[in-house]
Amino acid sequence: MNEKVVMVSNGYERIDGRNAYKSGIKRLTLGAPMLEENKKMQIAAQIWKNDKDGELILAQELPIHQILELMIFLSRTLLYFKDAYRLPLLYDPEKPLVERVGLQGDVLPIEVCVDNQNINEDIKAFAQSLNDLGELIGERKRVLNRILEELELY
């Protein structure tokens, strides 16, 4: 299990958001990919849970570039919802595109999912959930911001 793991964070269940102290996620790791589908990447993040016998098992794995892209996606979404209240439906049905983020010679399009038949209700619930999670999100954004600022110094 520890083969090719370089960085580890044990005890994740203590800080897992609203699941803190009740989470099934026990450990986060960074190292060489373990899943065949990720072998082309050099580094991946792994999420570990206990199986029914209490042994740690790999629950999820993502290459680090996908984690960064999820952070870009989430960050842009958070920025979008800061001003979405100005739109009656929280989005413009005629212009669902939020931003096209340039990456790797192409783009990561970020848009409201107008294919969702219940988007008008779901986007309101999503916005309310972001508001309800404000304290959890805010704390993590502050920590992430501090670390990103430190990275800029290198």
Task: Identify the residue ranges that each predicted region occupies.
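N-terminal "first-domain core" detector
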Residues: 1-38, 53
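A short, structured beta-strand/loop element
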Residues: 25-60, 82, 89-103
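Short, solvent-exposed segments of well-ordered alpha helices
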Residues: 53, 57-65, 106, 110-113
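Elongated alpha-helical scaffolds
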Residues: 67-76
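Solvent-exposed amphipathic alpha-helical surface segments
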Residues: 77, 81-84
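Charged/polar low-complexity intrinsically disordered segments, enriched in acidic residues
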Residues: 96-150
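C-terminal non-catalytic accessory extensions
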Residues: 153-154
